[in-house]
Every structure is written in structure tokens, then in C-alpha cells.
Amino acid sequence: MFFFNTKPIVFLVVLSVVATFAAATPAMLARGGGSSCAPSTSLKCCDHVGTFSEVSPYINPLELVGVIAALLGLVGGLFTSVTLALTCSGIDIGGSCNSQTVCCENVVFNGLVNVGCTAIDIL
């Protein structure tokens, strides 16, 4: 019979399993032409994303005045191509988003309406 110390072998097996799982951990990467958020923007998870005409049916009439004022201040009145994001919440590191992930420049009404957004896809 062969008697030998199995502790080093068990250690190497456990170490290789841990290294395999660490290497297989998914990373959050921007894809689809988007980029990660710039320092002046914030990462949000939003229910409705689009131009003013696309998201206007989802805007509460009481919030509409603030949205238009923010758009006018952002681009001098030419806001047809600016992307808006509605009903947004912040995303923490390791968090998930079941709606559209965006990076937004301006936040109006504490995240309810976001102006100057860029949609990104997170892997």
C-alpha cells in the first residue's frame, strides 16, 4: 500500500476550482455602439426611453413643464433628437436592470425624467 499526504493534492484541486469560477465571472461591458458612462453622467435603469414624441404619452402633465424647461436649457429649443428616459432608478455595482440601461446627463424630478440619455446594453 502506498501512503502519502493528500493535503497538497486537495489544495491544488480546490485552488483550480476557485480560479476557474473567478475567470468565468461575467463582466459588465458596453456593447452595441454604446459606451460606459462618462464621469458627468449617471447610469440608470429606465422604463421608457426615446425622443420627446416617443415618450410623451408616458409623461404626467404636471411634469411636462419641467421636462420642456430642461430640454430648452439643454439644447436651446431644438429637442427633437434628444433622448429622454422616464421612470428611472440608479443601478448599483452588480445590480441588474430589467428595462433599458442608459447614461443620462441631466436628471429632472429626482430620476423620474432624465434628459440627454444614451442607451447602452450591459452584458
UniProtKB/Swiss-Prot annotation:
Major localisation: secreted
Listed CDD domains: hydrophobin_I
Gene Ontology terms, MF aspect: structural constituent of cell wall
Pfam assignment, any one: Hydrophobin
SMART domains xrefs: HYDRO (SM00075)
Transmembrane intervals: none
Claim: rRNA-binding is one of the keywords in the record: no
Keywords: Cell wall, Disulfide bond, Secreted, Signal
Annotated S-S bridges: C37-C103, C45-C97, C46-C88, C104-C117
Compartments reported by the entry: Secreted; Secreted, Cell wall
Keyword Disulfide bond set for record: yes
Residues making up the signal peptide according to the UniProt record: 1-24
Superkingdom of origin organism: Eukaryota
Cellular component GO terms held in the UniProt record: extracellular region; fungal-type cell wall; membrane
InterPro entries recorded: Hydrophobin
Functional summary from the UniProt entry: Aerial growth, conidiation, and dispersal of filamentous fungi in the environment rely upon a capability of their secreting small amphipathic proteins called hydrophobins (HPBs) with low sequence identity. Class I can self-assemble into an outermost layer of rodlet bundles on aerial cell surfaces, conferring cellular hydrophobicity that supports fungal growth, development and dispersal; whereas Class II form highly ordered films at water-air interfaces through intermolecular interactions but contribute nothing to the rodlet structure.
Protein family per UniProt: Belongs to the fungal hydrophobin family.
Subunit structure: Self-assembles to form functional amyloid fibrils called rodlets. Self-assembly into fibrillar rodlets occurs spontaneously at hydrophobic:hydrophilic interfaces and the rodlets further associate laterally to form amphipathic monolayers.
Protein name: Unclassified hydrophobin 9
Lineage: Eukaryota, Fungi, Dikarya, Basidiomycota, Agaricomycotina
Gene: Hydph9
